[in-house]
């Protein structure tokens, strides 16, 4: 009877040890599977997780190793040069790029741009008259009573001279023809001589130079006079508009 009880005790202990061994094996397998799953999950990145960057101060990931974290380093963004530069003057003057330029630019937008008009580069009416009253050949100012004796455009006189037909015997002072003097680069005078009224036209135009040369010189003078008058009118309009704008401000 004692032997049977011992055998039963041995068999019970062996079965319990087998159960313990089996349970330990199951636990080891579970640990291995968990480890393999965790390792595989740490290496496998799905398309949903690709590109995700976590902050360093995130409480869910603050205990991770620093070598596994992606740090965001702030850097200054470089803007393209083409996005800050305004239109160049070559693009503005080009006829192919006129359709790209709008007319909605206001006055503050034009400040500092190539379209800004500097008042230093605009001639006033007085400056234009001073320019027209100067010799284009030697540069002296006829309006200031300056003259060059060896210049054909000056002709030895500034604004007036005695009658060239009778050498001043009639007492009439002839006035300078600015347009003709500038166009022909020779002194031209306008006046009427009391002693010889029939030769006035011959003095105003060069005698003996031919009808063709006289006609071309007269046409050039008329064209220059027209341009000067047009420029004067534009300057007057510009000065009027500038004065009105300054009054509104």
Curated annotation (Swiss-Prot):
Protein name, as recorded: Protein pinocchio
Keyword Transmembrane helix listed: no
Q: Name one GO biological process term.
A: olfactory behavior
* UniProtKB keywords: Coiled coil, Olfaction, Sensory transduction
Q: What phenotype has been reported when the gene encoding this protein is knocked out?
A: Reduced attractant response to some odorants.
Cysteine pairs forming cystine bridges in this chain are none
Instruction: Please give the coiled-coil regions recorded for this protein.
Output: 218-238
Give the residue ranges for region: Disordered.
1-40
Function of the molecule: Plays a role in olfaction.
Expression tissues: Expressed in the third antennal segment.
Q: Does the keyword Coiled coil apply?
A: yes
UniProt record similarity statement: Belongs to the pinocchio family.
């Amino acid at each position: 009877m004692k032997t049977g009880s011992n055998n039963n005790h041995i068999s019970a202990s062996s079965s319990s040890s087998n159960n313990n061994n089996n349970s330990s094996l199951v636990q080891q397998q579970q640990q291995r599977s968990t480890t393999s799953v965790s390792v595989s999950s740490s290496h496998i990145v799905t398309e949903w997780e690709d590109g995700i960057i976590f902050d360093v101060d995130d409480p869910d990931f603050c205990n991770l190793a620093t070598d596994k974290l992606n740090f965001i380093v702030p850097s200054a963004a470089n803007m393209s040069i083409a996005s800050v530069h305004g239109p160049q003057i070559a693009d503005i003057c080009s006829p192919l790029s006129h359709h790209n330029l709008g007319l909605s630019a206001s006055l503050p937008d034009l400040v500092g741009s190539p379209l800004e008009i500097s008042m230093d580069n605009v001639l006033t009416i007085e400056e234009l008259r001073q320019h027209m009253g100067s010799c284009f050949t030697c540069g002296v100012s006829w309006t200031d009573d300056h003259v060059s004796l060896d210049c054909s455009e000056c002709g030895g006189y500034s604004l007036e001279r005695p009658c060239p037909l009778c050498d001043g015997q009639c007492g009439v002072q002839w006035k300078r023809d600015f347009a003709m003097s500038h166009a022909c680069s020779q002194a031209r005078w306008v006046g009427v001589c009391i002693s010889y009224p029939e030769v006035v036209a011959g003095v105003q135009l060069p005698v003996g130079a031919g009808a063709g040369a006289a006609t071309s010189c007269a046409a050039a003078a008329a064209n220059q006079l027209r341009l000067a008058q047009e420029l004067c009118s534009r300057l007057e309009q510009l000065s009027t508009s500038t004065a009105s704008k300054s009054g509104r401000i």
